[in-house]
Amino acid sequence: MREVELIIIGGGPAGITAATEAARIGASVALIDENENLGGKVFGPTGNAIKGSVSDKIEKDIRSQLLKDFNRVRDKISVFLNTAVWDIVDQRIVSLYPTDGSDKQINRIKGAKLIISIGAFEKAIPFPGWTLPGVFSVGGLNTLVKKKILPGERFLLAGAGPLQLVLANHLINAGANLSAIVNAASLRDITASAFPLFASIDSLKLRSGFDYLRNIKRHNIPIYRSHIISKVYGTREVEKAEIVKIDRSWNPIRGTEKEISVDSVAYGFGLIPCTELTRLSGCKHIYDESRGYWRVELNERRETSVPGIFAAGDGLTIKGYSAAIAEGRVAALEACAQLDRVQRSEADRLLQPALRKLKRFNRFGQIMDAISRPRPGIFNILTDDTVVCRCEEVTMQDVISAVADGAADVNDIKRRTRLGMGHCQGRFCGQVINELMWRLTGVREQREVFTPRTPVKPVPFGCLAGE
């Protein structure tokens, strides 16, 4: 079993920055990422093959500089690509498996310190028809469009959050027919957030936001505010979508339904942190009502409740790549100070600029999360036959029956229905099961989360045998 001073899980902006900083200081580092290239979702090698905004161009420049700095010290870093982490033992030993089918010899790595920077995934709310071919997540469709792949002819965007604007502009610039943008946030919500948003955002993001809106207006794309997608129709694939106006609590208003002929729908409600590894490691988590998701508790130096385990990037809270870069630097400097690789006074001095930036980034993230956080009324669009857990094909009726039979909590629902036992390990259905149970029981109890289990992701039996 190989041993290093610092293990970094996740090779996005936070992980790359942390590895670069720690290696520059002189610590022995292992950097692990599931993908064949470093960079994560934003700075990955897919790039952007279409004409973009000023923001897209700046992202390319930042990515280039990030990788240039990393490559200067890469020979000092043990890099494991196409490698996933499926277990963390004794809070220091990381179990690995190859995602590319290769026969890699290293199954475990032990580290004195651990930085978890595995990013985030999209928040999805089920609706009738969401399993039809032609329904995409906002991020999933954006990845295709950036590669100049248009999987349809008439597109509709639905949900809430800033990713909508980004995808809308990529679709427009790729020459797609964007039929409409359906945004759950009301004009009142957006107006109320305007001043604090402007105060917390840098000029580049502000300029890009206005550029996006101008581009949408210039192409006469209709925007339906205070609306959600309520249903998708189709025999074998998406043929049309139904949208409906909502009130302040996102309850659908009957009689306001409108059908739009489309063959592709992208929707989502922002991002939520990936917490499976921090939960598996025993780190304390809290549910942040203002943000609408579980997050790991940590101190200013990004150390969790488990000494020696740090977290950075969107795996903490959603703030974007600039914040992820700053957090990777903070976590690495603190870890290296604890390893006696850098004097405490020097680490404290180097930390300050990043910590000051993070205060502003955090305010920006809080505002974006508040705008995109789903309100309770949206769950009224679910019908009995709506699929809640896609992996195990568990429907709303299955959940209703389990609660009627006495299911007491989310883990009881999981045992009775297999909800959350599929390939994604409850990453999507786990987002909504609390709300569904509360609606069925009429009792809003303490929010719960699925008990973390190993392996956190499906692994081959051969890998387990190798352990």
Where are these regions (language model features)?
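Residues forming the flavin
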Residues: 1-467
